[in-house]
Amino acid sequence: MRIVFMGTPDFAVGSLQALCESGKHEILAVVTQPDRPKGRGNKLLQTPVKEYALAQGLTVYQPQKVKTPEFVELLHELQPELIVVAAFGQFLSKEILELPKYGCI
């Protein structure tokens, strides 16, 4: 199945890992929150989902807002059959929720 995965913290990595290891799905893209400065030096830190996705060679997108027309158009172009969301951190518009053939979970 053609899947777009949306998630950010450690909690979401397990779900992405299970999808990758199943060997039954094509992960079209991983969408996660933008890198944020943390710590004393305000060093930009990648999200746990981004770290895992890059290690797997997956395409990663980090939009400030997923509701922008540009990002919605990108999702249309990817043509996912399913969007899997795990602790993503942004509300998805009705248009995004209805875009995949099998919806969003």
Descriptions of predicted regions:
Residues 1-105:
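One-carbon transfer enzymes
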